[in-house]
């Protein structure tokens, strides 16, 4: 059995998403068991805040040095990794530093520490990058003064913006990028910037990278905008609370990398109480990732991997467009236009809540077969075959949902999911499960109203599986084929984001 605490690495040959790449670089991400402020609602003095920040900075220093020793050229630390969470707007005040805009001002905090007051964290991060000769990405709390009296003004009443902010330092310590998180997730201490920021930075070893933070990954701005602008390498600090069966962070990190055809450097917090774990270095053809097991020591984890450069400008040619692979007509699976027009499942359908959304489900009752389940006019199609009989006591269902998710965020989705149910009753379908014994070969297909569809296969023990085949057609049909599953199947999913249907 696989352990959650294991670092997994796999390389794969997916559908031909890009041309072969003969250039590479070494990336590192650090999953940080951060030292928290025990009472974040109580305001501190600047000295007290610095004493707390220093405890986490000292850990960052050790990990940056370890990464550099392994040849890393860039390291990513997680969201909230220095200060923590659950502050009020007032109580975070002592943690704030004003981060200058690198597009307006060239500043190396390590070499010019006296240029700006109250920038101790910026100075230490700058020197950390410089000492270890690597690019460094960290997340911190930023204060930007603004004018309340200006008309019109979106400035907060206290005359300052407080931003959840990613900062990037060049290998010589120069501050080269600043990104203010746009899609906040219950963050009372911070403001969303008035407009979404599309922020990139260039490196001499891999070209261009784009910056997003945690909840941003689910939204059009800035994430999809970056990808549509041709940014193929994304930095992703996160403090992500996992939720099965569809949005465990490693599951969606991998799905996003595949669906968007990008490299994702993802660093998460490790906090067992908040169900936070899961970091990785993902490309369209490889993944190195870590997911802790319940009961594992609550500690940090450094991941280092060599990955191909994907920036087409750096490579000097255009990357492939991501067209679907040729259909394998001998596969035994249906890829014709009639797949989704197949007769509806003879199994009765039922509604059960999954991720707080009312999915329409049908049970897999046969050893093999095909079925179609619809939620409104959105339909999901499945062909399946049980490979082993040992897991036939486990219940599986095909689920479909087309609508707006409204709990802990509001966004429109279309989802096709093959899930193992938590128990032997249909009402358990959609509940959280992380173990399974059943092995199935399958092809899952849906016709989506968006190009932004993210495929994933998750097997027992929080192990990611490489989909054998993913195809996307011009008419919105997306299919996910997988066989020879390594472990019991927990979830297979096509997660579509309907950005054009999002409402405030």
Curated annotation (Swiss-Prot):
Keyword Hydrolase attached: yes
Subcellular location: Secreted, Extracellular space
Record carries keyword ATP-binding: no
Domain CN hydrolase: 30-309
InterPro entries per UniProt: Biotinidase-like_euk, Biotinidase/VNN, C-N_Hydrolase, C-N_Hydrolase_sf, Vanin_C
Domain of life: Eukaryota
Cited function: Catalytic release of biotin from biocytin, the product of biotin-dependent carboxylases degradation.
Similarity comment text for this entry: Belongs to the carbon-nitrogen hydrolase superfamily. BTD/VNN family.
Name under which the protein is recorded: Biotinidase
Organism: Takifugu rubripes (Japanese pufferfish)
Gene: btd
